[in-house]
Amino acid sequence: MTDLRHIDCWVFDLDNTLYAAECRLFDEIDARMTAYIKERLAIAHHDARTLQKDYYVRYGTTMAGLMREHGVEPDHFLDYVHDIDLSPISENVALANAINALPGRKYIYTNGSVAHAENVAGALGIFHLFDDVFDIKAADYTPK
């Protein structure tokens, strides 16, 4: 195994990285983004979906487009889209042991919110292993 003792800082992406994409949590977030746009802008589902993808391409995140084009308050958007069912994931002892064995500080970096990171990493049984979360708000809403 490679000697990792010289590394003093680890940064982990959250969604579809600390848990398998097959859990489909991000699919639920994606669907909630469309629903949010549909409700907020009072437009048809198809139009909301098209706008969601357009904003993602043009602004780097759907939220950035909504903030710029419609004055959407980001915390409200993040709370709404991250209100998801976490039952597809469960405590991952092997992942916890692997992260715990790494030397140095450990951080979660996410385009989501701190609350979302706490909820997901908590469900995985690993949140306590991290020193902090760097979320989209800490990044001044600039996506990774």
Map each language-model feature to its residues:
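N-terminal helical cap/lid subdomain that shapes the substrate entry/recognition surface
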Residues: 3-12, 17-96, 115
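Short glycine/proline-enriched coil/turn segments at helix->beta-strand junctions
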Residues: 71, 102-106, 126
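Glycine-rich active-site/cofactor-binding loop and its immediate structural neighborhood
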Residues: 101, 111-112
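Small/polar loops that bind or transfer phosphate-bearing groups
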Residues: 21, 108-109
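Short amphipathic alpha-helices and their capping/turn segments at secondary-structure boundaries
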Residues: 1-5, 119-122
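Short, charged, low-hydrophobicity "junction" segments
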Residues: 49-50, 105-108
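Substrate-recognition "cap/lid" segment bordering the active-site pocket of phosphatases
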Residues: 107, 114-144
